[in-house]
């Protein structure tokens, strides 16, 4: 993927460039953390996150995703979730996920993803129970 006038998160940090909208930027990072836990991407680093000139975040390099671990990668930073994603995470049927992913993933990769999804649901629900829905869930 090529994005004109973009920078990596690594360069943004190095050059100390503040996001235009820190709150939205942090929420985008929450969704990255959720996604990386769901697919068990164990190679997320500041060099494979690209920020376009509108401050949209692009995740690149998922070559080390869909690991066979049933546990979550690291949910310590995952403290919020977008409401629609939260709803879909809870309601999507395993069979629907399997049907969509089976052309691309092996059965055991899908099985691990589904187990991680359940653990993400538990994690986010625990946060909601402890902090309240408005503190955890957000809407774009």
Spans of model-derived segments:
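Phosphate/dinucleotide-binding and metal-coordinating scaffold of catalytic cores
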Residues: 1-140
